[in-house]
A protein has these predicted regions:
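A short, Lys/Arg-rich alpha-helix, primarily the initiator
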Residues: 1-12
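Residues within the helices of the helix-turn-helix
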Residues: 7, 18, 47
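The alpha-helix within a helix-turn-helix
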Residues: 10, 21, 50
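Short, charged recognition helix plus adjacent turn
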Residues: 12, 51, 61-66
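Short alpha-helical DNA-recognition segment
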Residues: 14-30
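DNA major-groove recognition helix of helix-turn-helix/homeodomain DNA-binding modules
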Residues: 44-59
Length: 66
């Protein structure tokens, strides 16, 4: 499943995939794979991404329940 919330949060901060990757010490390809839903990041990486974007884990990585 694509992670459009991550892509949207990254765009809202005006960061490229490479810039976000540099902030969290991973490759641009890793960020791309997470956004495409091809890679499930570790909890440590999820936390790093959230800190870089100023978001919560819930906001970026957990689907809303109805």
């Amino acid at each position: 499943m694509k992670n459009l919330r991550l892509k949207s949060a990254r765009a809202a901060k005006d960061l490229s995939q490479q810039q976000l990757a540099d902030l969290v010490s991973v490759s641009r390809q890793t960020i791309n794979a997470i956004e495409k839903g091809d890679y499930n990041p570790t909890i440590r990486l999820c936390i790093s991404i959230c800190q870089a974007l100023g978001c919560t884990l819930d906001a970026l990585f957990w689907p809303e329940t109805e």
